[in-house]
Amino acid sequence: LKNDKMKKSILILCVLLMAAIPSACTESHKTPPELDKPQPGPNPDPKPEPSEGKEKMLWFDAEANFQRFSTQAGIIAMLDKTQEAGFNKIVVDVKPVEGDVLYKSEFMTQATTIGSVNVADRGWDYLQFFLDEAHKRNLKVTVSTTVFPMGMPSTRQGPAYRGTTWKGKTCMQYKPEGMVDIKDDPTKVAAFLNPVLPEVQEFALRFIREIVTNYDFDAYALDYCRFPDYQSDFSEASKEAFEKYIGGLVETWPGDVFTYNASGERVPGKYYKEWWEFRSMIIHDFVARVRKEIKAIKPDVKLEYWAASWWGALYANGQNWASKAFRPLTDQDAWSFNSWCSINYHQTGFADQLDTFLLGTYLPRVYGPDDGESIEYGINRAERFLLNACTYYATVDCSQKTFDIEEACYYCLKRTAGLMVFDIVHVINNDMWAAIKRGIDRYEAEAATE
């Protein structure tokens, strides 16, 4: 669903040009930065997984498909094609970064405008219709929401720009030119609320509880459950929370975290490493709260979380999806973590809070054990970092026509417990239905003989 803007490529530029709507692949779902450069290392042999029960998921992004899924006929047609292609589960996005929702809520506003696309009040429950039609086709359903975004700075749309409810609660960015509220920064894809604030967390838990209570589905996926990037949040509230975390006063704010040099590069301060640990612990603790809330309402609903596979860049977003048992500073790639990783950073790992981690191997090549931009490399790394703390599925982006989606689907199913393809808009635009089916069928035929 989010990043630190080291990975600024927008995955579905073609959708913007063709449909003049916001990109399906917003900050949360995008291509990797140059940061993760592998050193030569061992080449783990692929470990076959049992085929029974493996989930093959297709993501239905709310923004990129806003017009397409404005009618029931449009939804039905795509669910039929999804089933025919071999998928057995869908992900339905019901809270895009714009902040309004696509389910029946007692306190959230219905999404009728995203970017330049306007959809009249449907008069029917978008999420319930998806659920009813998916169940008719024996498709499982994951419901996904962005967690902390509440508006789009590029268009100034969303709850963050209406009224005063969220005044002073969106992230305060520390940039080379000074402090800038994220909702006033059109370069950012989403106006994030500050995850540090208790009232923000309570609000997010409220809509999560509402969805889990009122709908019958299989899993809940957290998207954009993170900080926007390294520039956020530097509000007074975050300063006070950080001081409580370290048990002392920060004399120079924000300079004791970092400053900028003349080139706009970060220069670490004395609390640099502790700062990233603090922010990751905020996200860890929130994910743990979400799990507790969901399981208290419906114990069988699984908690899922999507994040990019390039773990070494995600400290800037507070996303430590690794196991607590993983020790970054003794890993083979420790050389690339030393500059920011504290001795206790491993304690912020939240893999053990998840039922399923959706590993964002949104990478251009399938094979290459020493290629940091290959799915194989991303899966090998995840095995080291997750240490069986949770089930995980490899997930792929098929926005590029030249991407070998057939081989990617086959390999992801062979190596991990499941598959997620992002996003249906790419599958449609690139006509990848047949190739996906070939990849799924090849894996299942092979697995049936093992």
Language-model segment annotations:
Residues F337-E450:
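Substrate-binding cleft of secreted/luminal carbohydrate-active enzymes
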Residues P50-F69, T142-N214, N261-Y272:
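Active-site-adjacent "subsite" loops/lids of carbohydrate-active enzymes
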Residues F87-R122:
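Aromatic-lined carbohydrate-binding/catalytic grooves of carbohydrate-active enzymes
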Residues L102-I114, P149-P186, Y224-S263, A316-L329:
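Aromatic- and acidic-residue-enriched segments that line the glycan-binding/catalytic groove
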Residues G151-P153, Y230, I297, K302-Y367, ...:
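Substrate-binding cleft/loops of secretory-pathway carbohydrate-active enzymes
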Residues F87-V94, Y126-D184, A221-R226, P299-E304:
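Glycine-rich, aromatic-flanked loop segments that form ligand/cofactor-binding clefts
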Residues A73-D100, Y215, H346-F357, R415-G418:
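Catalytic domains of carbohydrate-active enzymes, especially glycoside hydrolases
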Residues A20-E52:
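Bacterial Sec-dependent N-terminal signal peptides
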